[in-house]
Structures are given as structure tokens and as C-alpha cells.
Regions:
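Ligand-binding loop in jelly-roll beta-barrel domains
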Residues: 68, 95-118
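A short glycine-rich, His/Asp/Glu-containing loop-to-beta-strand
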Residues: 27-52, 59-63, 113
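Short acidic-glycine-tyrosine-enriched beta hairpin
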Residues: 36-39, 77-95
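Histidine-centered metal-chelating micro-motifs
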Residues: 50-53, 91-101
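Glycine- and acidic-residue-biased ligand/ion/polar-headgroup-sensing regions
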Residues: 58-77
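Hydrophobic h-region of N-terminal signal peptides that target proteins for export
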Residues: 11-18
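Bacterial N-terminal signal peptides that target proteins for export
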Residues: 1-6
Length: 120
């Protein structure tokens, strides 16, 4: 009985940590799932100047900027990137774990398409 309780607790911790890096879980107030299937997840993201995300992970993704914004990304390897977008800019990334911060004077408003592993 005690062994089953310990195993159940360990399994629950593993399941919680598996979702801990999901941006929808870490920053649900900023991300909204627009579509999800076995190949992609489409997200709308909005934040305000000065706001910061918790650390999270994206698989390979494409971002489309709905308006101009400026962000700082702190990557887990210690690098810090500054990215500035104009309305209509598009960016592809192989995926990364990061903390994002709006360092501009306008809201960040993007559509993000995360690419899931899939077989043709």
C-alpha cells in the first residue's frame, strides 16, 4: 500500500514536470490555443510593455507579428537576445527554452504556429 502511494506520487510529479515547460501552462494569461491537432498547435500571444513570461519551451515554430514590438529573450544557455518586429514580420525558429520580456512601448501581439513531430 505504502509502495503504491509513493509510486503514485512520483508519477504525478513526473506528469506535472512534463507540462511545466508548456507556455500555455506557465503563462496561460498570455497564450490562447486557437487550434491544435497531431501536426501543429496555433497560439495567439499578447502581453503588455514591461511584462515577462515564466521559463517555457517551444518546439520548432513560426511567429507572425500582428503589430510592432520589442522583446528580450533570455535563453537557458545564458545568451540574451533582443528582437524587434514590425507588423507583418515572420520568424522561424528551431525551438528554444526561454524567458521573454516585452521591453518596448507597445503590446506584443503574435500568432505562433508550433510544429509537432509527425510522419508524412
Amino acid at each position: 500500500m505504502k509502495r503504491n502511494l509513493i509510486l503514485s506520487a512520483a508519477l504525478m510529479c513526473l506528469m506535472a514536470s512534463a507540462h511545466a515547460d508548456d507556455p500555455v501552462q506557465t503563462d496561460g494569461d498570455k497564450y490562447k490555443v486557437l487550434l491544435e491537432n497531431d501536426r501543429v498547435r496555433v497560439l495567439a500571444y499578447t502581453d503588455q510593455p514591461g511584462e515577462k513570461t515564466r521559463q517555457h519551451l517551444h518546439p520548432a515554430f513560426v511567429v507572425y507579428a500582428l503589430g510592432p514590438f520589442k522583446r528580450r529573450l533570455s535563453l537557458t544557455d545564458g545568451r540574451v537576445l533582443t528582437r524587434e518586429f514590425k507588423s507583418g514580420d515572420v520568424l522561424y525558429s528551431n525551438g528554444e527554452a526561454h524567458i521573454g520580456e516585452n521591453i518596448g512601448t507597445t503590446p506584443t501581439q503574435i500568432i505562433m504556429v508550433e510544429v509537432k513531430e509527425s510522419k508524412p
